[in-house]
């Protein structure tokens, strides 16, 4: 599902622990790290896509997390030209994302990257809330900055 401007609807997932760290996932067979994210299917709400992607990418179920906040609008990024599939129709030039801030309420050992036949990640770690800004690929950096900034006031840290 690609909108009339060429952007694919997508959800981004910022999963936090009790001390305010975020889950940072390593793309399979790469030294590239990012937050879990994934496309929204036809007739699927952003929240439904969130739970599906959460399960597919990190093995967690709805009962393992609590939604703390969601970005108000869509945040967009353009793909670098080298990643645009120019022979695909409709043409996708980037992603438009709704970002969700979640708190892990289930056990940490429930995080699993190997539950699907084609896993997207092969490792993960907890990092400080703002750490991803200096690490994510350049073309996603502004969306990460906007999402983290908007959602930061809703971050819950337990003593």
From Swiss-Prot:
<comment type="function">
    <text>Accelerates the degradation of transcripts by removing pyrophosphate from the 5'-end of triphosphorylated RNA, leading to a more labile monophosphorylated state that can stimulate subsequent ribonuclease cleavage.</text>
</comment>
<dbReference type="InterPro" id="IPR015797">
    <property type="entry name" value="NUDIX_hydrolase-like_dom_sf"/>
</dbReference>
<dbReference type="GO" id="GO:0006402">
    <property type="term" value="P:mRNA catabolic process"/>
</dbReference>
<dbReference type="GO" id="GO:0034353">
    <property type="term" value="F:mRNA 5'-diphosphatase activity"/>
</dbReference>
<protein>
    <recommendedName>
        <fullName>RNA pyrophosphohydrolase</fullName>
        <ecNumber>3.6.1.-</ecNumber>
    </recommendedName>
</protein>
<keyword id="KW-0378">Hydrolase</keyword>
<dbReference type="Pfam" id="PF00293">
    <property type="entry name" value="NUDIX"/>
</dbReference>
<feature type="domain" description="Nudix hydrolase">
    <location>
        <begin position="6"/>
        <end position="149"/>
    </location>
</feature>
<dbReference type="InterPro" id="IPR000086">
    <property type="entry name" value="NUDIX_hydrolase_dom"/>
</dbReference>
<dbReference type="InterPro" id="IPR020084">
    <property type="entry name" value="NUDIX_hydrolase_CS"/>
</dbReference>
<comment type="similarity">
    <text>Belongs to the Nudix hydrolase family. RppH subfamily.</text>
</comment>
<dbReference type="GO" id="GO:0005737">
    <property type="term" value="C:cytoplasm"/>
</dbReference>
<dbReference type="InterPro" id="IPR020476">
    <property type="entry name" value="Nudix_hydrolase"/>
</dbReference>
<dbReference type="InterPro" id="IPR022927">
    <property type="entry name" value="RppH"/>
</dbReference>
<feature type="short sequence motif" description="Nudix box">
    <location>
        <begin position="38"/>
        <end position="59"/>
    </location>
</feature>
